[in-house]
A protein has these predicted regions:
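Long, structured ligand/cofactor-binding scaffold of large enzymes
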Residues: 55-254, 261-266, 370-373, 387, ...
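Acidic, glycine-rich flexible loop/linker segments
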Residues: 572-587, 799-872
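Mobile "lid/hinge" segments at catalytic clefts and subdomain interfaces of large enzymes
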Residues: 196-338, 347-348, 441, 447-459, ...
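Extracellular/luminal Protease-associated
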Residues: 285-292, 529, 751-752, 756-796
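Terminal amphipathic helices with adjacent charged low-complexity linkers/tails
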Residues: 83, 101-156, 283-284, 289-400, ...
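Extended C-terminal subregions enriched in glycine
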Residues: 460-505, 713, 773, 779, ...
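N-terminal amphipathic, basic-rich helices that act as targeting or association modules
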Residues: 2-149, 292-302, 306-330, 632-675, ...
């Protein structure tokens, strides 16, 4: 871990648990190296990591000097190596990561090396949270039944993880039914200060989920990366990035009565998206921090991917210490955190000088009002009072012209009719909000008030409560609010991501028939962080993000075609109208309930048994041995082809000639569009493959659970039912046109035809290509389809990195140019000029030849951003690079 003391900065710090060594940032100040006192706190953490890890090979003295002299106005475009202290994984991205490690071990043996060289060198925690689905709901049996179904569907994956637990050191699995990875990280895993070999240093991490940034609320630097990049970190590689710009977000005032942390984060997301912070750090500062609970901070940090930032950081301060105490962390750890951060100049107080920032924004918390976001993007905020007119305005965008049909829900227990805007899913879900006691207690109090007035959930609404940790269940029970939530159909359905990631399960059949029969624009209201098309449920077109109390309110109303500020939710038994304002809890009522229902003993009790898991987990045994025994008949875990027949040395970089366009897409194409996580259709290429292997459609599970099998995932790439390939106007789904035949076919089948003829492929895209989840299979699947370059107006940070990590060339149109302006429609043949002299961000010429002989020449910017990424690209990917290095060592 610690490799040297080049600056003479090593010192000793006394704590209540004894002395620790550390690397003094103040030594740099004493030596006249930089103005550290006014650096952003997030940059100070990166600086400490460089100072501690100087070895003049991976990390040099120049790296320390460059960060210490960070220029706020124009940070130098210099590559910074960062060695995170640990890695967190969730199972949808974690299983394929461990599959890759197993495949690397197999490849190492084929290359004559020691397979044990492939082993995590930093602590890795995998939390199983992505597999539970909402099959049963509104029942006291829902939790147990959904858990049983989860194990039935995923037993093979879980057996594989059991093998991984035994085969790899530094690797821990947190079993199903414990919670959501980011909430578990916040409440349990994060120490804020780590100690290794007697050296104390700031906790830091990367995670295979974009919402890893939630931990920034605790003062821990961490962000989401693709699985392939996380695997490289596990194997001892640093993260390389350009020196970041840091945007300061100044908060003042306090949240007003009636507004929640959810309203705040939707406001901040809208502001920061407009400010364009992709690839930048955001750091919150100002007097408003003193009135924000740590849970509120975590909510703001969680949605950094939605506003586009790498991190959304809050410095460690007195509230951090109080949170550590409230969540049952050991007193000696809290003492170490306080002493270490104060000694290092990393501890914020009201009197701390405001840091220097590249740019700043400001928000008075008093200006935050009740809000929602949707129907397609989290940055599209809508004031609650404007929901009705905004809904009317959105309807034509879903193809509705004229009057909305009214359809009977036939076969349901209660006779009902629904129309456009019917809320068919109301889900209290996602670590973004279930980690925040104020909004969870608020939802419970609103439910209690609603039940007291005789209100009920609309019968067509599929309602669910999926807390991010078991502690939530305990404090709701202690506050006496669980029974009211149960009465409205918000029984706990599982401890995992559920609806937020598309695991909403099927709609009740009568509701599904009504929606499809009437071609209704049905709606979902969820307390999640993403609402992209096709994500929540394939039958739900309009998706709105809202606070947990508003989720309960809309479950009662049963429609978004309503103005909750002026129209009643329903009537009480006496026929009196009941309005939202009548049942909305006051801030004081929420604060009192939080104070009386929560204590550190809850966290100690629940997390004291976190590693044991439910009985279903304890019964599973994995195979033995350092090498995984691949089963050719498995439909869940297969050895991926990435390292099979890999040459010892890489070939020189060459141009791409005679390429065809496989897919052409517009702006904001998400990783969900590229590699969906949800259900597998029986008539899709992946569905047909599974049926050919003897898997019945009811046993397909979902794409996310099949990520250990490249055969399924390659067929599922660009298979989202809401994908709009502009090469096939008027269609949705995974279809394209094969050239020169002109045949309309599935994207997978077209790719295989091109492969058979040795034709390389490209993808054309608009702005924000690859936005959304950190999903490395969006890059892996792209590569396995034969795509060698993606030409886009702009890229989201993680997906660009993942493409490079898989050896796919990201090219960006020059400012003012685009697919449209150049007249590219996907029928062209592309030649991309490239050779072994490639350097970061160089100009790359592209020639597109049209069928009529016209030739379009244009220049792009190569989005291989750093020198080490050139090395990765030359080797065919980051893991290929690491494997070759380890094989030679």
């Amino acid at each position: 871990m610690t490799t040297g003391n080049a600056f003479g900065a090593e010192a000793t710090l006394k704590t209540s648990a004894g002395s620790v060594r550390y690397f003094r940032l103040r030594k740099l100040v004493e030596d006249g190296i930089g103005d550290i006192e006014t650096l952003p706190y997030s940059i100070r953490v990166l600086l400490e990591a460089c100072l501690r890890n100087v070895d003049n090979f991976v990390v040099t003295a120049d790296d320390v000097n460059n960060l210490a002299n960070w220029n706020a106005a124009k940070p130098a475009e210099i590559e910074v190596p960062f060695k995170p202290g640990r890695v967190v994984l969730q199972d949808f991205t974690g299983v394929p990561a461990i599959v890759d490690l197993a495949a690397l071990r197999s490849a190492m043996v084929r290359m004559g090396g020691d397979p044990k060289k492939i082993n995590p060198l930093v602590p890795c925690d995998l939390v199983i949270d992505h597999s539970v689905q909402v099959d049963e709901f509104a029942s006291r049996f829902a939790l147990q039944r959904n858990l049983e179904i989860e194990f039935e569907r995923n037993i093979e994956r879980y057996q594989f993880l059991r093998w991984g637990q035994k085969a790899f050191n530094n690797f821990r699995v947190i079993p199903p039914a414990t919670g959501i990875v980011h909430q578990v990280n916040l409440e349990y895993l994060a120490d804020v200060v780590m100690t290794t070999n007697g050296v104390a240093y700031p906790d830091s991490l990367v995670g295979t989920d974009s919402h890893t940034t939630m931990i920034n609320g605790l003062g821990v630097v961490g962000w989401g990366v693709g699985g392939i990049e996380a695997e490289a970190v596990m194997l001892g590689q640093p993260i390389y990035m350009l020196t970041p710009e840091v945007v300061g977000f100044r908060l003042t005032g306090q949240l007003p009565e009636g507004s929640t942390a959810t309203d705040l984060v939707l406001t901040v997301t809208q502001m920061l998206r407009a400010h364009k912070v992709v690839g930048k750090f955001v750091e919150f500062y100002g007097p408003g921090l003193d009135g924000l609970s740590l849970a509120d901070r975590a909510t703001l940090a969680n949605m950094a991917p939605e506003y586009g930032a790498t991190i959304g950081f809050f410095p460690v301060d007195a509230e951090t210490l109080r949170y550590l105490e409230r969540t049952g962390r050991p007193k000696q750890l809290v003492d170490l955190v306080e002493r270490y951060y104060k000694e290092q100049g990393l501890f914020r107080t009201a009197n701390s000088p405001e840091p220097r920032f590249t740019s700043t924004l400001q928000l008075d918390l008093a200006d935050v009002v009740p809000s929602m976001a949707g129907p397609r993007r989290p940055q599209d905020r809508i004031l609650l009072k404007n929901m009705l007119p905004e809904w009317k305005k959105a309807l034509p965008g879903f193809g509705r012209t004229g009057a909305s049909p009214t359809v009977a829900v036939e076969g349901s227990e209660q006779p009902a009719q629904i129309s456009d805007g019917a809320v068919v899913i109301a889900a209290i879900t996602s670590c973004t909000n279930t980690s925040n006691p104020s909004v969870m207690i608020g939802a419970g109090l609103l439910a209690k008030n609603a039940v007291a007035r005789g209100l009920k959930r609309a019968p067509w609404v599929k309602s669910s409560l999926a807390p991010g940790s078991r502690v939530v269940t305990e404090y709701l029970r202690k506050a006496g609010l669980d029974t009211a939530l149960d009465a409205l159909g918000f029984q706990t359905v599982g401890y995992g991501c559920t609806t937020c990631i598309g695991n909403s399960g099927p709609l009740p059949e009568p509701v599904a028939k009504a929606v499809t029969g009437g071609d209704l624009v049905a709606a979902a209201v969820l307390s999640g962080n993403r609402n992209f098309e096709g994500r929540v449920n394939p039958l739900v077109k309009a998706n709105y993000l809202a606070s947990p109390p508003l989720v309960v309110a809309y479950a009662i109303a049963g429609t978004v075609d309503i103005d909750l500020s002026t129209q009643p939710l329903g009537q009480d038994p006496q026929g009196q109208d009941v309005y939202l304002k009548d049942i909305w809890p006051t801030q004081q009522a929420v604060a009192d309930a939080v104070a009386s229902s929560m204590g550190p003993e809850m966290f100690i009790e629940q997390y004291g048994q976190a590693s044991a898991g439910p009985p279903e987990w304890q019964k599973i045994s994995g195979s033995e041995g350092d090498l995984y025994q691949w089963d050719a008949n498995s439909t869940y875990v297969q050895e991926p082809p990435f390292f099979v027949d890999m040459p010892t040395e890489p070939a020189p970089i060459q141009g791409i000639e005679g390429a065809r366009c496989l897919v052409s897409v517009g702006d904001s194409t998400t990783t969900d569009h590229i590699s969906p996580a949800g259900s597998i259709k029986a008539n899709s290429p992946a569905g047909r493959y599974l049926q050919a292997q003897g898997v019945k459609p009811e046993d397909f599970n979902q794409y996310g659970a099949r990520r250990g099998n490249d055969r399924v995932m390659t067929r599922g790439t660009f298979a989202n039912i809401r994908l709009r390939n502009l090469m096939v106007p008027g269609t949705e789904g995974g279809v394209t046109v094969h050239y020169p035949s002109g045949e309309q076919t599935s994207i997978y089948e077209a790719a295989m035809k091109y492969r058979d003829h040795g034709t390389p492929l490209v993808v054309l895209a608009g702005a924000e290509y690859g936005t959304g989840s950190s999903r490395d299979w969006a890059a892996k699947g792209t590569y396995l389809l034969g795509v060698r370059a993606v030409i886009a107006t702009s890229f989201e940070r993680i997906h660009r990195s993942n493409l490079v990590g898989m050896g796919v060339l990201p090219l960006q149109f020059r400012e003012g140019e685009s697919r449209e302006s150049l007249g590219l429609d996907g029928t062209e043949i592309f030649d991309i000029s490239l050779d072994d002299r490639l350097v970061p961000r160089q100009a790359v010429e592209v020639m597109a030849r049209k069928a009529d002989g016209e030739v379009v020449h244009f220049v792009t910017t190569c989005r291989i951003d750093t020198p080490v990424e050139v090395v990765y690209y030359r080797n065919g990917g980051i893991l290929h690079t690491v494997l070759r290095q380890l094989a030679k060592s």
